[in-house]
Design a protein with these regions (language model features):
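C-terminal binding/interaction regions
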Residues: 40-59, 106-174
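The feature captures the alpha-helical scaffold/lid subdomain characteristic of nucleotidyltransferase
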Residues: 2-39
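Hydrophobic "anchor" residues
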Residues: 77-78
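Compact, glycine-rich, soluble single-domain proteins
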Residues: 82-96
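Short, charged low-complexity linear segments at domain edges
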Residues: 93-112
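Short coil/turn segments at secondary-structure boundaries
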Residues: 4, 61-64
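Short beta-strand scaffold segments in enzyme catalytic cores
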Residues: 63-74
Length: 174
């Protein structure tokens, strides 16, 4: 318990004087319950995406890295990518870049994805990225997308692609 208390004090350095007011057992129970429910996956994905997010100009016609993304594969691996903005339509979103990295490494099933915008906030995948993800696997509708890093608000891909045009084809591929 002392280790949990110390870890929480380091993660949340605010005054927790409830321990001095006879509330320690209640606070201990609440902390243990909260820690048991804590899933650091979104933090790992967000940090992985931020690590590769370095906005830079490759040439007068290509800028990269203003947006980054990280995907968690079904095998538990994390793959990252950055956006590639070109002077014509040959660019690539960070999400599709991360997915291409995953595919290059022999995987094709996504569990979670986060896109990090240039301001550091989580952002939603564009329509092309949503479509690409839906076409990857028959379970793609269950992909969790981080909407807000601070609150860990999540939405499933199927909520963003209602009545998807090729559900029947994906189900027939079984």
């Amino acid at each position: 318990y002392a280790k949990i208390k110390k870890d929480l004090a380091q993660k949340f350095p605010y005054d927790i004087d409830g321990y001095c007011d006879g509330k320690e057992n209640f606070v201990r129970e609440m902390e243990e319950r909260a820690l048991a429910q804590y899933d650091g996956t979104w933090d790992k994905l967000y940090i992985a995406a931020r690590k590769v997010q370095h906005e830079r100009k490759l040439s007068p016609l290509i800028e990269v890295g203003s947006v980054s993304a990280a995907v968690l594969s079904a095998k538990g691996n994390i793959y990252t990518g950055v956006c590639i903005d070109t002077a014509c339509s040959l660019g690539m979103c960070a999400e599709r870049n991360a997915i291409a990295n995953m595919i290059t490494n022999g995987e094709s099933q996504i569990i979670k994805i986060v896109a990090v915008m240039s301001d550091g906030k989580a952002g939603m995948p564009c329509g092309a990225c949503r479509e690409f993800m839906m076409q990857l696997d028959k379970t793609s509708g269950e992909i969790e997308i981080l909407r807000d890093y601070e609150t860990k608000k999540v939405i499933r891909l199927k909520s963003l692609t209602p009545e998807w045009w090729s559900t029947d084809k994906m189900e027939m591929s079984e």
